[in-house]
């Protein structure tokens, strides 16, 4: 059976890995997953990520903890295959009053809600991270 929503699978693996206090989690790789991991690293939610393998590349995400608690408190998928969610630049949500980020897929690539607002771009809301 094929995977219907690979992004939800990625977010669930990260959530489950942090709940089990894992150092890192592995998952099948794609360009979108690598872009999400790069954004999470840039925002300080994960330590690092790496793509391993050539024929079937795997993405390994190294999770981040602070005082033995996961840095990511909430990881929620918003736009999904059955219900896409698009927002204009002035309608982009503020997650936890600006303490979290919304990952937005824009015409200029994946970026945080703050970066999209600054660039004057709207797009598809992929997920919330807090």
From Swiss-Prot:
The keyword RNA-binding applies. It comes from the Bacteria. InterPro entries: Ribosomal_uS8 (IPR000630), Ribosomal_uS8_CS (IPR047863), Ribosomal_uS8_sf (IPR035987). Transmembrane segments: none annotated. GO terms for cellular component: ribonucleoprotein complex; ribosome. PROSITE patterns: RIBOSOMAL_S8 (PS00053). Coiled coil: none annotated. Disulfide bonds: none annotated. GO terms for molecular function: rRNA binding; structural constituent of ribosome. Part of the 30S ribosomal subunit. Contacts proteins S5 and S12. Belongs to the universal ribosomal protein uS8 family. This is Small ribosomal subunit protein uS8.
């Amino acid at each position: 059976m094929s995977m219907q929503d690979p992004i939800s699978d990625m977010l669930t693996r990260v959530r489950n890995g942090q709940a089990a206090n894992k150092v890192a989690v592995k998952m099948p790789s794609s360009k979108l997953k690598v872009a999400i991991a790069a954004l999470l690293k840039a925002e300080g939610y994960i330590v690092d990520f790496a793509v391993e393998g050539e024929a079937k590349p795997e993405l390994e995400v190294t999770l981040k903890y602070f005082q033995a608690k996961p840095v990511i408190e909430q990881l929620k998928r918003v736009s999904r295959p059955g219900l896409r969610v698009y927002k204009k630049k002035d309608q982009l949500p503020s997650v936890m009053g600006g303490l979290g980020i919304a990952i937005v897929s824009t015409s200029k690539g994946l970026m945080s809600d703050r970066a999209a607002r600054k660039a004057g771009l709207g797009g598809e809301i992929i997920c919330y991270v807090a």
